[in-house]
């Protein structure tokens, strides 16, 4: 499952281990019990979520491939209960792929120049920075040094492996109007995938544990 985001980004589900029933099994092992019928299994997930018994959800694990601007990735990497591997600008020549916000992104802000000019200025700086990057590489400057001229709207790619408990914490903080708009879009994509793979857990999360303010308003 792959969801396109922003102008060139995406979130792609690479792998998932477990589902709603994984949390049920993990919770019932305390009583040396397993699965029961669907109604009682689903009720248990709601009970766990309502009362803050979160460790059973750590047995559901997702791996995502994410393409995002560097400034989004740096916010993402603050979520430390996860595993990350990122594209290296030291070992790879970086492509001309930059996030350019549309003029609509700036609607509602009191800028002293038109939004269209903001977009043009960002594009001009990006062009100059990338030309400089290529010139440095062609001059024999190592990639690890040449890359420092590139701005934060450069796209990077990374793998993110995270359990469902930590994923829900990510959604609490990033699927929220206080988060930057760009990372909100990625959080909405993560929520869509989470909902598809773990519908009972997602529903219980929204009902009892979600602290943000956009998932309930947006169809995910």
From Swiss-Prot:
Annotated FAD binding sites: 55, 78-80, 86, 163-165, 169
GO BP annotations listed: dTMP biosynthetic process; dTTP biosynthetic process; methylation
Motif (ThyX motif): 78-88
PROSITE patterns tied to this protein: THYX (PS51331)
UniProt keyword list: FAD, Flavoprotein, Methyltransferase, NADP, Nucleotide biosynthesis, Transferase
Gene3D superfamilies reported in the protein's UniProt record: 3.30.1360.170
EC number: 2.1.1.148
UniProt-recorded Gene Ontology molecular function terms: flavin adenine dinucleotide binding; NADPH binding; thymidylate synthase (FAD) activity; thymidylate synthase activity
Superkingdom: Bacteria
Enzyme class: transferase
Residues annotated as domain ThyX: 1-208
Details of cofactor binding: Binds 4 FAD per tetramer. Each FAD binding site is formed by three monomers.
Function: Catalyzes the reductive methylation of 2'-deoxyuridine-5'-monophosphate (dUMP) to 2'-deoxythymidine-5'-monophosphate (dTMP) while utilizing 5,10-methylenetetrahydrofolate (mTHF) as the methyl donor, and NADPH and FADH(2) as the reductant.
Subunit structure: Homotetramer.
Name the record gives this protein: Flavin-dependent thymidylate synthase
Organism: Thermotoga petrophila (strain ATCC BAA-488 / DSM 13995 / JCM 10881 / RKU-1)
Top-level taxonomy: Bacteria, Thermotogati, Thermotogota, Thermotogae, Thermotogales
